[in-house]
């Protein structure tokens, strides 16, 4: 039997908040691995996705959006995003083609030059007509002449196959780091916490989702192969608890049901989910929470 030649490539996806990084990762992997919401700064840590295409294993890093950080948490998120560049063979800079390049976008482009990084630019959301697309293309061709440009739609999948073909062509002969059916190296308890946090983002209004985090305290496989999950929603103020619980606990029950359904779809087994709310003043200043969030 002839051993298959294995190739590997690591790819970092970086860009502004809500530019489509997580949507692209999910599209490529074929599973909803990275949470997606309309709110900015949803992704807080590096989410690793893995896809193996015949002889080539592609390891993708979805990163927090780049923005002007203020508090300790935001600074850690942005620092985490930039640090991912150093472990990647290829950098994909995703740009929202529906918006003009703003000051932060130009700062990111300048940073690539300072770091001697030649990114691949992905002009995302081309499924919607944009009056800025041609101007963005023209600017990038002048400012980064060595970089390739791929107009794509991460949401609809347009040109993602072309992008994957290019990524695959850049892979080098190297043993795979993961099994050929792995889609991530993240612990299931971490993924479960992210799923619940996504539902909190989607179901809580205004700024409250940014003031909380979720930790999986118990992840137990039962004899019938179902999973029991205990999670704690950590908030910084007592006044937030009533909002999360809702009248007679209806809000947290609804969030729990939606989270459980997504977990069952991803884990392919029944899930028993129990949610608790805990007040932990100034949790954003505690190192233990950053270690749990992997930032």
Curated annotation (Swiss-Prot):
Residue ranges of domain KH type-2 in the record: 204-281
Region (G2): 41-45
Membrane topology of the entry: Peripheral membrane protein
Chain residues that bind GTP: 15-22, 62-66, 124-127
Gene3D superfamilies: 3.30.300.20, P-loop containing nucleotide triphosphate hydrolases (3.40.50.300)
Annotated region (G4), positions in chain: 124-127
A Pfam short name: MMR_HSR1
Region G5, annotated ranges: 152-154
Chief localisation class: cytoplasm
Keyword S-adenosyl-L-methionine attributed: no
Protein family membership: Belongs to the TRAFAC class TrmE-Era-EngA-EngB-Septin-like GTPase superfamily. Era GTPase family.
Record-given protein name: GTPase Era
């Amino acid at each position: 039997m002839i051993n298959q030649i294995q190739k590997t490539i690591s790819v970092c996806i970086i860009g502004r908040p809500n530019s489509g990084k997580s949507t692209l990762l999910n599209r490529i992997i074929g599973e909803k691995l990275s949470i997606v919401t309309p709110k900015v700064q949803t992704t807080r840590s590096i989410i690793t996705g893995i896809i193996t295409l015949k002889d080539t294993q592609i390891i993708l890093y979805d990163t927090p959006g780049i923005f002007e950080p203020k508090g300790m948490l935001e600074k850690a998120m942005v620092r985490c995003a930039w640090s991912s560049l150093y472990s990647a063979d290829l950098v994909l800079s995703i740009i929202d083609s529906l918006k003009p390049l703003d000051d932060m976008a130009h700062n990111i482009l300048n940073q690539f030059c300072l770091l001697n990084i030649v990114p691949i630019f992905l002009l995302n959301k081309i499924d919607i007509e944009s009056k800025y697309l041609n101007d963005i293309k023209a600017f990038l061709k002048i400012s980064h002449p060595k970089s390739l440009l791929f107009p794509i739609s991460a949401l609809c999948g347009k040109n993602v196959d072309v992008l994957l073909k290019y990524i695959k062509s850049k892979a080098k002969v190297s043993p795979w780091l993961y099994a050929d059916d792995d889609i991530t190296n993240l612990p299931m308890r971490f993924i479960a916490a992210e799923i619940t946090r996504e539902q909190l983002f989607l179901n809580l209004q205004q700024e409250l989702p940014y003031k909380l985090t979720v930790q999986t305290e118990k992840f137990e496989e039962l004899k019938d192969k179902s999973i029991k999950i205990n999670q704690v929603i950590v908030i910084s103020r007592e006044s937030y608890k009533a909002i999360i619980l809702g009248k007679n606990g209806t809000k947290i029950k609804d969030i729990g049901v939606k989270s459980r359904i997504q977990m069952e779809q991803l884990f392919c087994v029944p899930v028993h989910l129990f949610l608790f709310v805990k007040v932990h003043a100034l949790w954003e200043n505690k190192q233990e929470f950053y270690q749990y969030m992997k930032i």
